[in-house]
Curated annotation (Swiss-Prot):
Coiled-coil region list: none
Cited SMART domains: ANK
The protein's name in its UniProt record: Putative ankyrin repeat protein R837
Phylogenetic placement of the source organism: Viruses, Varidnaviria, Bamfordvirae, Nucleocytoviricota, Megaviricetes
Keyword Transmembrane helix: no
Organism: Acanthamoeba polyphaga mimivirus (APMV)
Length: 626
């Protein structure tokens, strides 16, 4: 008997909301509770939940009850057999896989995606079942092998290779993947099945192995694959090592065990770079190891600045204990600590004597963008220059960055000539800053009118600041529409183009410039809009088909042909430029739409041969038109 109707609708809603994810179990308690689905206020995939919990009996009941209106609308209506099959392959339930295939799911759906997902998750029984059913293990560019290797499923990798999958695809990608993810057994097995070891990129192998952190793989590479002994000698020049950038990878990913292995085997070179990278990424153990073993080679000042970039108080303290004179680099440490966003580090550095002696623009942008007023005011106590200069710099940077809360706070504290900042604020599109300064009588509309020139307007348009453009127009600023429209078209700002034309101008007033710019930029949406506004495609001197052909924009070539242009039939230039620019797609498009391959101006086949365009030669020979 169904008792769900005994409680009001609102109470069931509260129960369902309270249960959160456990509500799924409530729905599946018995068949009567299915009716609670009508009370659900959210969309969810209960079928996926059933698959994940491997509730075969519930699944069978649902499919046997398709005539039930609730089940039909809430389950079967939204069930996709193929996607349910994929979920089953991912969860590794072969019974469900067989169930959905029996119900009509395509076991080779989306180029054998079920097999690929099962292989990626290491479900050998499902893979074997699908292969026996005709699935192709090589589909989707060896998807099955590539992801089995990535996820470390050794038995799966072995099975796929035994079935004949190609381990060389994508330039031996699986070898590098096994190194990157540290799967030693898989890497060794792959090496045993390679025919030509020289095909492997040795530098790439090492880079991936250093990133993956497997000492076993690194040892195998050194002992069994390549001779890189000299790479780590002191005799190797810094420029050579910089080109390899191999050891820096250890610093970046913090693989201490590999670093120690290399140290025990070789005398490492350029350890200063490794240490700086490790400090930058916060790998304390690497930095400590290098300080212990190679102290005399390290630039401690550079090292502590990298540690400040990372924001690591622990590392900064450790380096100071090594004897760094903080007074000599206090400004740099504070400036780089600002980049880290770590307020605690700023406090620590100021407490031990660091002071700001200069205000570099790059650091000030970070200061106003990522710190609160309290921290900015705090730093005022630790500067070695005039406080007013600090306030003015904060204010000017805040205006350029559009930080309105800081502008409001410092507006009456600074001694700036705000008129001189109008161009910069407007160029950066900060309408709110300009309006605020106007309201505070720090600038006037006349200041804006006198200051703004065409160059500033074009900069606004280039960066897509449409709100600023509209605001300036509302102030009566004159816009040179011709240049403005061309800039908006060239940079793909369709909303600005629409706005400029809404000001009452005809698109053909400006000659061929807008359509030409849109065509060169390969912006088909812009071209379509301009045409919809009445742009005449024949206004372009060289014809749009020629212009699109010379730049290789095949979609635009076809679009202009579809609009009715037959320039390519009467003129040989589009085909000529497509051939000499080796653009087969454009050549095909022109020929398929009536362009002759026998011309008086030039011989297309001979021209293609002259430019060594073999594919075009073959195509033209097979599609020769008198």
């Amino acid at each position: 008997m169904d008792y769900t109707h005994l409680l009001p609708y609102e109470i069931w809603l509260n129960i369902i909301d309270f249960l959160d994810k456990d509500k799924y179990n409530l729905y599946l308690t018995n068949t009567n509770f299915f009716s609670l689905l009508d009370y659900s206020r959210e969309y969810f995939n209960l079928i996926d939940f059933i698959i994940e919990t491997k509730s075969m009996e519930v699944l069978k009941y649902i499919y046997q009850s398709k005539t039930n209106g609730l089940i039909r609308n809430r389950f079967v209506k939204n069930i996709t057999l193929n996607t349910s099959l994929l979920t089953s392959c991912q969860n590794g339930n072969i019974l469900l896989v067989k169930f959905f295939i029996e119900k009509g799911a395509n076991h080779r759906y989306s180029e054998d995606k079920p097999l690929g997902i099962a292989a990626a998750n290491g479900h050998s029984d499902i893979v074997e079942y699908l292969v026996n059913g005709g699935a192709n293990i090589k589909s989707r560019n060896n998807y099955a092998l590539r992801f089995a290797v990535k996820n470390g499923h050794y038995n799966m990798v072995k099975f796929l290779i035994e079935q004949g999958v190609d381990i060389t695809v994508f330039d031996y990608e699986v070898f590098y993947t096994s190194c990157e993810y540290g799967h030693y057994e898989i890497f060794v097995y792959l090496m045993k099945n390679i025919n030509d070891i020289k095909k492997l990129n040795k530098k790439r192998l090492l880079k991936k192995a250093f990133k993956g952190g497997s000492v076993k793989i690194v040892h195998y590479i050194f002992n069994d694959i390549l001779d890189v002994y000299r790479m780590f000698y002191h005799s190797m020049t810094r420029s050579e090592l910089k080109n390899y950038k191999l050891l820096n990878i250890i610093g970046k990913y913090g693989n201490h065990d590999i670093l120690e292995y290399l140290h025990n085997r070789y005398q490492l070179s350029d350890t200063n770079n490794i240490a700086q990278v490790a400090a930058l990424y916060g790998h304390f153990r690497i930095v400590k190891f290098l300080l212990d073993k190679y102290l005399h080679e390290l630039n401690l000042n550079q090292l502590i600045i990298s540690a400040c970039d990372n924001g690591s108080i622990k590392m900064v303290k450790f380096l100071i204990e090594k004897g760094i004179d903080i007074n000599t680099i206090g400004n740099s440490c504070l400036s780089h600590a600002i980049l880290s966003g770590n307020t605690d580090l700023l406090h620590y550095l100021t407490n031990i004597g660091c002071r700001l002696t200069s205000l570099e623009n790059f650091f000030m942008k970070n200061l106003v963008s990522f710190y609160d007023i309290e921290t900015i005011n705090y730093l005022r106590n630790y500067i070695t220059f005039d406080d007013q200069h600090y306030i003015n710099t904060i204010m000017s940077t805040s205006m350029y960055c559009g930080i309105i809360k800081l502008v409001k706070y410092f507006v009456d504290k600074s001694s700036l000539d705000y008129e001189s900042y109008i161009c910069g604020i407007i160029s950066n599109g900060h309408v709110n800053i300009i309006k605020y300064l106007l309201n505070q009588n720090k600038i006037t509309k006349q200041n804006i009118t006198i200051t703004i020139n065409n160059s500033v307007i074009l900069t606004i348009i280039q960066y897509g600041h449409i709100d600023m453009l509209k605001y300036l127009v509302s102030l009566g600023i004159n816009i040179c529409i011709n240049y403005a429209l061309d800039r908006a078209v060239s940079y793909g700002h369709l909303n600005i183009v629409e706005y400029l034309l809404e000001l009452g101008h005809n698109i053909n007033e400006f000659g061929d410039l807008p359509l030409r710019s849109a065509t060169i930029a390969n912006n088909i949406n812009m071209v379509k809009y301009l045409v919809s506004q009445g742009a005449n495609i024949y206004i372009i001197k060289d014809n749009p088909i020629y212009l699109a052909s010379i730049h290789g924009h095949v979609k635009l070539v076809k679009y202009f042909i579809d609009l009715g242009s037959d320039y390519h039939k009467k003129n040989e230039l589009p085909l000529y430029v497509a051939i000499i620019n080796n653009n087969l797609d454009v050549v095909k498009c022109l020929v398929e739409h009536g362009c002759k391959t026998k011309t008086t101006f030039f011989d297309p086949i001979e021209t293609a041969m002259e430019y060594y365009n073999n594919e075009i030669v073959e195509y033209l020979q097979n599609n020769e038109i008198k």
